[in-house]
Every structure is written in C-alpha cells, then in structure tokens.
Amino acid sequence: MGRRRKLDPSRQRIARNVAVFRAARGYTQHELGQLAGLHRTFIGAVERAEVNVSIDNVDRIALALSVDPVELLAPQQP
C-alpha cells in the first residue's frame, strides 16, 4: 500500500475553486478542458488536487473560466 501524502493547501484551494467556478458556469470537465486547451483528465486531476498546476495552466484555466488567475488561489469565502 502506498504512503499517504499530505495535500498542499494551495493545491487544494485551486482544486476546489476550479470545481466551483466550473460548476457555476455549467461546464463539464470536458468542456472546460476544450476551452482551456487541456485534456479533460488533466482538469479532473486538478480538481482532485492530484497534480501540481503550472502557472501557465492556471492562466489557461482562469481564462476559460473568465476569472482572474488569483481567484483560483483565493481561500474559500464563508
């Protein structure tokens, strides 16, 4: 059995925010991937906090979601 790794808080914020913004716009992971020029499996991995996302891909995802890239790193609002 593999060793469990503690998830990075920034990666978790990006995962949650991408999923929230995507759902709010009614996009599937496939649709967001197409808009961002990324594969749907990569979008899924981002939303599960399984990958470190490059700043270039944060920019691509933010542009596809029509948000400022910094919003993908913002803490969850109450």
Q: Model segments located where?
A:
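Conserved hydrophobic/aromatic packing and binding residues within compact polymer-binding modules
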Residues: 18, 32-33, 43-46, 72
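Recognition helix of helix-turn-helix/homeodomain-like DNA-binding domains
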Residues: 37-51
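DNA major-groove recognition helix of helix-turn-helix/homeodomain DNA-binding modules
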Residues: 54-71
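Short basic helix-loop element that most often maps to the first helix and adjoining turn
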Residues: 16-35, 60
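Conserved amphipathic alpha-helical interaction elements at protein-protein interfaces in regulatory
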Residues: 20, 24, 64-67, 78
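A short, Lys/Arg-rich alpha-helix, primarily the initiator
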Residues: 2-24
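Short, charged recognition helix plus adjacent turn
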Residues: 1-3, 63, 73-78
